[in-house]
């Protein structure tokens, strides 16, 4: 036991009480600092993840979509210029690509699967499967500073970045070692579904499933949408 000369017991108890009080304060402060640091770290990680998701879903500064059945098959930039909107005055680079309709529906593509769509996707089964040529896809990827994808004649790929249909597209790719589009039979080029964004719609709902085919195959297909891609 330690005795301090010149200090009475009351004073010693006061010192001990103050030390215990300060220890509790320091403990609480350290706990709060730990919680704050963790919260900031989690918040920063979440923000970075959301920013990355947003960037992947919106790879262009602008895209203008034109429904061919309504607007006709036209040059979008020329149409805008004729209406006093000259995109080239503002844009660093532009590309126009086209999306076609296959001669099959998504229900035919998903044949043999037990599918359950979200309410927003109730019209998907009866919709024609979207098709894009490999050249147009690579033009879109170049706008995003991405490397081109190689596809040989007689081959096809599937692209999808929408959670509501991704698993069905992945299963369809596995069950279709070959597929016929526009009267041309194509062999599966890869076993993995691509997850690229070639046009922008709403975040998380860019592509419910698109066939990527050689340029020659699209010649016999009906064009559905033209898209002007713009980077400022």
Labelled PLM ranges:
Residues 1-30, 36-40, 44, 48-59:
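Feature of multi-pass inner-membrane transport and sensor proteins
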Residues 16-19, 35, 66-68, 232:
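Short, flexible loop/turn elements at secondary-structure junctions
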Residues 52-232:
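Nucleotide-cofactor and metal-assisted catalytic machinery
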């Amino acid at each position: 036991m330690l005795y301090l000369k010149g200090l009475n017991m009351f004073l010693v108890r006061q010192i001990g009480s103050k030390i215990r009080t300060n220890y509790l304060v320091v403990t609480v402060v350290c706990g709060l600092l730990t919680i704050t640091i963790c919260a900031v770290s989690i918040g920063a990680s979440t923000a970075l993840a959301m920013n990355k998701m947003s960037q992947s879903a919106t790879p262009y500064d602008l895209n203008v979509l034109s429904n061919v059945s309504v607007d006709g098959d036209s040059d979008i930039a020329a149409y805008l210029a004729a209406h006093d909107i000259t995109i080239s005055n503002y844009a660093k680079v532009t590309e126009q690509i086209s999306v076609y309709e296959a001669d099959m529906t998504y229900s035919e593509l998903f044949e043999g699967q037990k599918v359950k769509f979200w309410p927003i996707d109730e019209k998907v089964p009866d919709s024609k499967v979207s098709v894009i040529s490999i050249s147009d896809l690579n033009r879109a990827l170049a706008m995003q500073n991405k490397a081109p994808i190689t596809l040989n004649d007689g081959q096809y790929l599937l692209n999808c970045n929408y959670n509501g249909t991704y698993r069905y597209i992945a299963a369809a790719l596995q069950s279709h070692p070959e597929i016929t589009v526009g009267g041309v039979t194509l062999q599966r080029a890869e076993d993995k579904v691509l997850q690229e964004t070639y046009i922008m719609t709403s975040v998380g709902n860019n592509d419910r499933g698109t066939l990527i085919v050689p340029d020659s195959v699209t010649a016999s297909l009906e064009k559905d949408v033209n898209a002007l891609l713009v980077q400022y």
